[in-house]
């Protein structure tokens, strides 16, 4: 993000506060932040549709709590660890706690929305069996200890991965890999939902969500919001950022559409029908797949990236369920962890020469543009370190909660549904 523009709202000096350019860029960032925040509604509808009716209230409350707690914790500490300007180092930012001596509020807004998105994605993988207070504590851990450090390494101009030359325009690693691996750790330690696997054969059994209508609505909200989420990472619409921000929107459109069509086609080949739920996930996988590269590639490359992203999603989803017995009700691990990895790697192949970073720091293009493998190595290092950091810390957290019996709800609560047991009754009332 900072790597894209040296004139971002975070680095603007006071002399430009009253310029037209400053107002236009700030307005752009605020509008984009609003769209990124609106992704919470998209994930809420998507996840509500993917869980069973008896857990609808639970999943919606989870998203509201995640967003609210993330706002407070990111305001107090999280943003400081990511972008604090008082004696920062290559490992972590420092200073500006509680936004003291910090006036780049538009930049804070979009960064908070990104952090909240990473937390919401992760907790979806643990739906229908995680205790509510564990959601709350995990949100604090994710927003204070996990997400800000990776964001600092990759997006801050002081970060050490930034100095190595990593390229992650809109968060393939910072958001999606972090969210995917933390959700996977939680889901793995929770274990599968009751009835997810046949007790005799061990084969997975279908536990379908209760509303494809909510899923479809959520998917369309996410697709719409993705334009603010990705194009907003340009941090402005003036000078040299106008064309890249526009190209980002085209790239995201093509990669998402290709991911959807690819997964629908695979489903027709293997299952004999077009699977709406898988198609929705393919759409999101396609969107995720272009997140790191969308500012640096040609539109034709977006189709290839979305196509491969759809394939990666389909087979990783199957392998996680059938080989690892990982019960992820919303498939967020396959979509975001594997999609985020592919997103980060794809930059090293398809990035065009001269677009990577800002005009003052030109890096070689991707392998297909004669750039060699130097960028690929940097991308792989960033991918591995994001997985290790987020996986290690979240693993310790969930293991500790499990050790003290505070991770999973009891059997009776799970069978009755979290809505009836913990939230005052069903989300649906029929006279």
Curated annotation (Swiss-Prot):
Residues 49-63, 126-134, 182-211, 271-300, 355-357, 401-431 are cytoplasmic. It is a multi-pass membrane protein. GO terms for cellular component: endosome membrane; perinuclear region of cytoplasm; phagocytic vesicle membrane; plasma membrane. GO terms for biological process: ammonium homeostasis; ammonium transmembrane transport; culmination involved in sorocarp development; regulation of developmental process; secretion. Keywords: Ammonia transport, Cell membrane, Cytoplasmic vesicle, Endosome, Membrane, Transmembrane, Transmembrane helix, Transport. It is found in: Cell membrane; Endosome membrane; Cytoplasmic vesicle, Phagosome membrane. Residues 1-27, 85-102, 156-160, 233-249, 322-333, 379 are extracellular. The chain crosses the membrane at residues 28-48, 64-84, 103-125, 135-155, 161-181, 212-232, 250-270, 301-321, 334-354, 358-378, 380-400. It holds the Pfam family Ammonium_transp. One of its GO terms (molecular function) is ammonium channel activity. Belongs to the ammonia transporter channel (TC 1.A.11.2) family. Ammonium transporter that mediates the import of ammonium in prespore cells. Controls ammonium homeostasis during growth and development. Ammonium has been shown to function as a morphogen at multiple steps during the development. May function as an ammonia sensor that relays information concerning ammonia concentrations to the signaling pathway involved in the slug versus culmination choice and regulates prestalk gene expression. This is Ammonium transporter 3.
């Amino acid at each position: 993000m900072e790597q894209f523009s040296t004139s971002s709202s975070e680095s603007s000096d006071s002399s430009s506060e009253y310029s037209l350019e400053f107002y236009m860029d700030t307005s752009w960032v605020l509008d984009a932040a609003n769209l990124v925040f609106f992704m919470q509604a998209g994930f809420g509808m998507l996840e509500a549709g993917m869980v069973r009716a008896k857990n609808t209230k639970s999943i919606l409350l989870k998203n509201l709590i995640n967003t609210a707690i993330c706002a407070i914790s990111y305001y107090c500490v999280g943003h400081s660890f990511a972008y604090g300007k008082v004696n920062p180092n290559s490992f972590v930012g420092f200073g500006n706690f509680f936004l003291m001596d910090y006036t780049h509020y538009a930049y804070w807004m979009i960064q908070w929305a990104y952090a909240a998105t990473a937390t919401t994605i992760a907790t979806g993988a643990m739906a229908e069996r995680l205790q509510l207070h564990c959601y709350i504590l995990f949100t604090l851990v994710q927003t204070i200890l996990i997400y800000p450090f990776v964001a600092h390494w990759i997006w801050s101009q002081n970060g050490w991965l930034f100095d190595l030359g990593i390229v992650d325009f809109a968060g393939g690693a910072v958001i999606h890999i972090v969210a995917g691996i933390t959700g996977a750790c939680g889901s793995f330690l929770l274990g599968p939902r009751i009835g997810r696997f046949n007790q005799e054969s061990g084969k997975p059994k279908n536990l379908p969500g209760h509303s494809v209508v909510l899923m479809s609505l959520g998917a369309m909200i996410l697709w719409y919001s993705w334009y603010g989420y990705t194009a907003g990472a340009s941090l402005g619409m003036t000078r040299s950022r106008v064309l890249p921000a526009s190209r980002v929107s085209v790239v995201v459109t093509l990669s998402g559409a290709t991911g959807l069509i690819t997964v629908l086609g695979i489903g027709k080949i293997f299952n004999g029908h077009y699977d709406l739920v898988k198609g929705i996930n393919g759409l999101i996988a396609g969107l995720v797949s272009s997140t790191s590269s969308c500012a640096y590639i040609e539109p034709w490359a977006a189709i290839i990236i979305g196509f491969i992203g759809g394939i990666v999603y389909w087979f990783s989803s199957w392998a996680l369920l059938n080989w690892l017995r990982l019960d992820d009700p919303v498939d967020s691990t396959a979509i975001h962890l594997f999609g985020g990895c592919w997103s980060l790697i794809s930059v090293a192949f398809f990035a065009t020469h001269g677009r990577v970073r800002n005009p003052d720091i030109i890096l070689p293009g991707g392998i297909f543009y004669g750039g060699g493998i130097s960028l690929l190595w940097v991308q792989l290092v960033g991918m591995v370190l994001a997985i290790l950091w987020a996986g290690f810390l979240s693993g310790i957290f969930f293991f500790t909660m499990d050790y003290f019996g505070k991770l999973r709800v009891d059997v009776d609560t799970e069978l009755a549904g979290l809505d009836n047991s913990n939230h005052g009754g069903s989300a649906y009332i029929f006279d």
